[in-house]
Amino acid sequence: MNSHECGAQACVCCPVLGEAIAAGNEGRGDTAHAPVRGTVVVQPQRDGYGRARPREPIEIDPWFGHDSSTASVVFPQRGRPWVTCDWPLDVTVRSPRATWDARFFCGYAFRPATADGTRSCLLGVPGDAGMSRVVCRPPPNEREIDVRVSPGECLEFSMAIIAPGSEMFWTAVPPRELLDYVCAKAMLLMDCLLSERVSRKAAIVPMLLLQEEAFLPSDRKRARWSDPDTPGRPLVTAEHAYASGARLECPFVIDLARRRNNFWAGMGLAFLPRTALSTRERILAKFCAHHIIIDVMTNLGREVVIPAALSMPGESVVMVVTSDEHGLRIDVRERRPTLNAQRAHAAAQQQPRRRNRRQQGTGASAS
């Protein structure tokens, strides 16, 4: 897990989630129930002189909103902790160049894309240099293959949308660790089921899909998520663009009252460009990967325990993502050592004491 630079107490996904966890730690001990102020990024609109002006109400695209009219169609499963859509969403990248700095925005690199054939959106995939893994082929071959797939080079994705089953929408920003966890389990199954010819050229990656009008700061050092109480501070270019834009929206908008979001979260199947795979192989791989993701999400427990990365090195904690009748909760807890670890720690502390006693006894006899 990579540590982030936002300085939050538990920086497990992005500044938004870090604020939610920090707020929960202050009010509820070690439990972080993401409040409204922690899940919605508030960026006030300003005029050309830097004066704040009232923010117009945000209208979420019904294509993104998981309200009652679309939830039964997108997520037909009910009564499960986690759900996924029955149909994959085809996403095509319009520009391979990353539009925003991936290091600043939750570790994702966003690119202008087209979803569902006609709808313009922003596609976010992991912004690291690539994904390296070792594929262990099942018997009788039992060979190990080094595979490296860079999501930034892929231009076409088949996205499987996932969501918490109780509310059928995200009540907090989806943790990157949760998406990586689901991705790892799905990749193990796909490597076992698909042939070596396909597994070397394909990968399942975490994905975020935002509306095209979402405001994403372009400068990691100068851009700001919220305006500090500093009178007379000049606006940066990104803030000028946000203040003057009529349709620009916050990166993550979570409407708890109407149970609607302005983003999708899920897993995407990506093929490396210039891959010598036939149309039949691509269709079968897409079909297989989509049903693997459905199987992983169906068997996912109500609580998912994931090692969490803290900004403080040396801390041992876990992140528990829970989806139940109370909604989605993200808890950060200390990892309690096992009984054997406690005994080993106690024995290690007693050894110096025994040495000191022996040395003291030897010194007394010599005198």
UniProtKB/Swiss-Prot annotation:
Give the span(s) annotated as Disordered: 333-367
Q: Which domain of life is it from?
A: Viruses
Which residues fall in a compositionally biased region of kind Low complexity?
341-351
Q: What is this protein called?
A: Uncharacterized protein ORFB
In the UniProt record, the gene name given for this protein reads ORFB
